[in-house]
From Swiss-Prot:
The keyword Lyase does not apply. It is a single-pass type I membrane protein. GO terms for molecular function: endogenous lipid antigen binding; exogenous lipid antigen binding; lipopeptide binding. Disulfide bonds join C119-C183, C223-C278. This is T-cell surface glycoprotein CD1a. The gene is CD1A.
Amino acid sequence: MLFLLLPLLAVLPGDGNADGLKEPLSFHVTWIASFYNHSWKQNLVSGWLSDLQTHTWDSNSSTIVFLCPWSRGNFSNEEWKELETLFRIRTIRSFEGIRRYAHELQFEYPFEIQVTGGCELHSGKVSGSFLQLAYQGSDFVSFQNNSWLPYPVAGNMAKHFCKVLNQNQHENDITHNLLSDTCPRFILGLLDAGKAHLQRQVKPEAWLSHGPSPGPGHLQLVCHVSGFYPKPVWVMWMRGEQEQQGTQRGDILPSADGTWYLRATLEVAAGEAADLSCRVKHSSLEGQDIVLYWEHHSSVGFIILAVIVPLLLLIGLALWFRKRCFC
């Protein structure tokens, strides 16, 4: 039954290569099904190339939505129409199957099923595939070696679920083929179609700021790095050539334009900040690291403060005198 949740992987073979893309890549389809009661349900489906969403499913029109100009890969409109029909039919059957077995499996409404399936590439070669199902956000079952296996922590419910799924070996064979054969060909074709976008280099911008005070006599220094692509980046607070091990990196977050943002913080005593710097390494910089010195940031801040405060005072005095003239 669960092979029906992978129709976006069921694409035709495509040529392609992953030249220039050295980091591990994956293509996966995520299916989230929310069952509020026996008749009310919600369906969310998306396709992802690593961290980049490339496809989604419009439940109202029952169509695949291509989020990038190259998301279609090398396939014709007719081929994608066939996939939409396949997806529509199999999604309905998947809902019916889960709802049919909900009572037998002791699924209590409301509940949520999450499925993620796909394949991985490393240095242009297939390195593995995966298909996992979660129930209520917890690991439940996974597909391995052509059959469904329960997670040990999932208990008897998961064992019974696997027993149901493994009754039809033909469907398991289809699932295995989708993961081990069709998906790798699809991701290679997708990489070829999106090569210009995926291999672009966008230089980061960086700036420094104060963070919330960590306590009396201490400062939080913040180094912001934004607008870079691809995602891998190295950011570190330095004292001379010595890396500061207290550097805390946040998550690398996506921006609306498809680039990335990161901030790195460091807490120090106020008197120890002067000779610190933030260093940024990124492939787009071609070895010319960005280095920002905290003492320069502080000097600029004092200059701005020295200019703005008197200016505000002059404006205030001018408004006060003007008000007195009208009285």
